């Protein structure tokens, strides 16, 4: 497929670390055709975000418009898979960080989403796990994340993503994060209730 773009560390950015705001990671979701991109290539402007709130909610804001193709569900699923997040705690919204919105060419998943969103989720998880390991004074390899909770295998200690999110926000964004093997997927490939269904039924959809 043409116009696919590789990405580097500068494609991911820790947006803020205000106490009480949790962990916020911004990243740039590029567009398939450079001719229609209104933003300069050398200016990194986040247009998608992951925010882990202290109350355990995970807010995902994406630039791709939901036009019935299911991207408000499929793209967050990629993030949740790599984060080891509890799907019931995911909330999705339309990003308004850019005046240019790019939805088309069936590129949301195959073009950029598959690796981009997974990498964003993996980075968020790695930062949360590292923060928990520092709190417990153990190695990150001794910890694992499951359903929005981080566990220390030996001691039995556990802490939720939200409870450690402010600490994670103080850490540097890692250069890279390891992605899961496809055989270990627990969310991707499953039938999920669409995140936009209720809002469209009750008339609150944007």
Annotated model-derived regions:
Residues 2-26, 36-206:
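Cofactor-binding beta-sheet edge motifs in enzyme active sites
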